[in-house]
């Protein structure tokens, strides 16, 4: 600000010194001349300020995790091979399979439009697992409030996960899918240094996998059973239209649509009563 007033004073002094030789004879003409000099000076010193959009801000806040070994898992998956824990329940839902609506078969011949052909899922078929759980024995882990960027904003009550249902972008080549965080793994539930900080995934039975994705994510990105992807956290407002918005009682977009429909019905009912 001091720089601005000093510059303005110099401009006015320059303007007065030029007035004697200026072609502008009237005071009105001279005032216009002085203002023009001021505007030219401001253009030279005022910085160009870039105001980021909401989307750009969120991308800056949550950087991409690149080159992450990615494996496929599914709701109802039995234990076996390199999967030591069955996926009948999740870290946050003891009735995961029944709440989803059934077995989320990975068999491509038994799927259509990213969902099983045998039923309509009651939760989002685009889901993932990351190797961190913010809750243990019904309480938040000591580091949770310190390492989870959105902890304060998402907190609702003691021991209620602020990670469940969080949105991620998963990128393979020129395609990006969006999914919700619904389970913890692969293999670990304590690696916050990777999930929220800068460490790489730790070695494990699946080539150091650091991300599990559902059959829907696999199909959208064209992934192999074990592949490599990039991922990042995203805000709900930055999730674009796509098949990940279509299903699920846990899906923010489905919830918003239902609330809108309920409001329209209620408004129509209230209007009819007044007639």
Model regions: which residues?
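Sec/Tat signal peptide C-region and signal peptidase I cleavage site
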Residues: 16-20
């Amino acid at each position: 600000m001091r720089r601005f007033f000093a510059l303005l004073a110099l401009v006015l002094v320059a303007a007065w010194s030029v007035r004697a030789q200026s072609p502008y004879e009237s005071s009105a003409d001279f005032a216009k001349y002085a203002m023009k000099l001021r505007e030219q000076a401001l253009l030279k010193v005022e910085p160009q300020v870039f105001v980021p959009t909401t989307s750009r801000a969120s991308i800056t806040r949550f950087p991409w995790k690149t080159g992450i070994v990615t494996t496929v898992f599914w709701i109802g998956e039995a234990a076996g091979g390199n999967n030591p824990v069955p996926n009948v329940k999740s870290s946050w839902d003891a009735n995961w399979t029944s709440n989803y609506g059934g077995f989320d078969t990975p068999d491509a011949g038994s799927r259509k439009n990213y969902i099983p052909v045998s039923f309509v899922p009651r939760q989002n078929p685009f889901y993932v697992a990351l190797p961190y759980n913010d809750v243990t024995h019904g309480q938040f882990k000591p580091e949770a409030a310190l390492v989870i960027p959105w902890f304060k904003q998402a907190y609702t009550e003691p021991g209620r996960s602020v990670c469940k249902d969080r949105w991620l972008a998963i990128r393979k080549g020129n395609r990006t899918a969006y999914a919700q965080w619904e389970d913890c793994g692969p293999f670990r539930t304590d690696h916050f240094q990777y999930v929220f900080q800068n460490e790489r995934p730790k070695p494990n039975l699946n080539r150091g996998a650091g991300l599990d994705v559902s059959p829907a994510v696999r199909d959208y990105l064209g992934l192999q059973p074990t592949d490599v992807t990039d991922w990042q956290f995203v805000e709900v407002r930055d999730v674009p239209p796509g098949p990940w918005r279509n299903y699920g009682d846990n899906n923010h977009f489905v919830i918003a649509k239902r609330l809108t429909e309920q409001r329209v019905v209620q408004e129509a009912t209230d209007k009819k009563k007044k007639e």
